[in-house]
Regions:
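Basic, flexible Lys/Arg- and Gly-enriched helix-loop patches that mediate nucleic-acid binding at interfaces
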Residues: 1-169
Length: 169
């Protein structure tokens, strides 16, 4: 949920997403992060190898976001976002795809395969747009679907088999 930090131990004593998870033998490991202003799908595991494989850039795993922006966005800017832009700190950010939602103005579905810090926000900022709302709706083949804010569930066997990385039980 927005306003909850994705860390298991916060020195500033802020609310963390880990407080919502059940107790397990071992520890929960987050697969990726969301910033404080972003909501949506987070995956957790107790297997460090799985977490590392799913987050490593060489795994080429896609993440899909629903984004509402403020500012003018046209085909030229869309092309720039797909080709890649300087997003500061000597980094290039780019989207693998971007499509407009037909029913809502300034709402887009963005897919990318890199997980740079605040990359979606930084790419849109590079073309003069501000992200108003950002929600991760998919990570690899796992979709958020109708899961409510703050809820969790375990992956099904079918979902585990759909993961892009080899997985052994």
């Amino acid at each position: 949920p927005c306003g909850e930090i994705v860390t298991s131990n916060d020195n500033a004593n802020r609310k963390t997403v880990f407080e919502r998870l059940p107790d397990i033998d071992g520890k929960w490991i987050n697969i990726g992060r969301l910033d404080l202003e972003t909501s949506g799908l987070l995956l957790f595991t107790n297997n460090g190898d799985i977490a590392n494989k799913m987050m490593h850039p060489s795994s080429n795993i896609s993440r899909k976001y629903e984004v509402i922006i403020k500012g003018s966005f046209n085909d030229i800017k869309k092309e720039q976002c797909i080709k890649g832009l300087d997003i500061g700190m000597s980094e290039t950010g780019k989207f693998d795809s971007i499509s407009a939602c037909k029913l809502t103005a300034n709402k887009y579905i963005v897919t990318l395969k890199t997980g740079k810090n605040r990359e979606v926000r930084r790419v849109f900022r590079s073309v003069g747009c501000t992200v108003i709302k950002l929600k991760r709706i998919q990570y690899d083949n796992i979709k958020l679907n109708n899961l409510l804010v703050g809820e969790y569930r375990y992956l099904t066997e079918k979902e585990i088999k759909l993961l892009s990385i080899p997985f052994e039980n």
